């Protein structure tokens, strides 16, 4: 077996003494850093390479920390606009994953880069840390590579989430096979053309 096989096997056993110690040290280290910061190299090189990262010019790695748990609805200065004060505030469930949120924040920070993919590193009680790999579309090297083909113009953060990287496809239900035959177009039309008179926010 090659070295990456051993690394991948070690990452699978998260209850082992080695990995429990490593995750504890990583949690402490990442808490001292900014919420979004650039990493010099991937924490899991085998996983990063599987997801399209290459250790060459034009590819960068960013580490992101995202808060876990429910999404709290903002009610500035307690302005509830005639609705009950405590209803529909705390127990809202965000429809997208933490990974999607992390990728969106990195895309907003690095407007000239394109998201390739991301993977989980560690989590604490209140936060989850993920790593995103990005490529530079304007670099000749990465434009030539088939992994990151496309025009050399930078994306907006919304386009970055909608392009054909795996999470963007998953969120929009794109793909081939029997799971992807039922189009969400009618449901989208119905949702956007219906009048909602909600008692609670």
From Swiss-Prot:
User: Per UniProt, which keywords does this protein have?
Assistant: Ribonucleoprotein, Ribosomal protein
Q: Which Gene3D superfamilies match?
A: Ribosomal protein l15e
> What InterPro entries does this protein map onto?
Rbsml_eL15_core_dom_sf, Ribosomal_eL15, Ribosomal_eL15_CS, Ribosomal_uL23/eL15/eS24_sf
Query: Which SMART domains would you find in this protein's record?
Result: Ribosomal_L15e (SM01384)
Annotated Gene Ontology cellular component terms: cytosolic large ribosomal subunit
Q: Name one Pfam family in it.
A: Ribosomal_L15e
Q: Name one GO molecular function term.
A: mRNA binding
Q: Which domain of life is it from?
A: Eukaryota
GO biological process per UniProt:
cytoplasmic translation
Family membership, please give it. Belongs to the eukaryotic ribosomal protein eL15 family.
Q: Tell me the protein's name.
A: Large ribosomal subunit protein eL15
Organism equals: Quercus suber (Cork oak)
Which gene does this sequence derive from?
Answer: RPL15
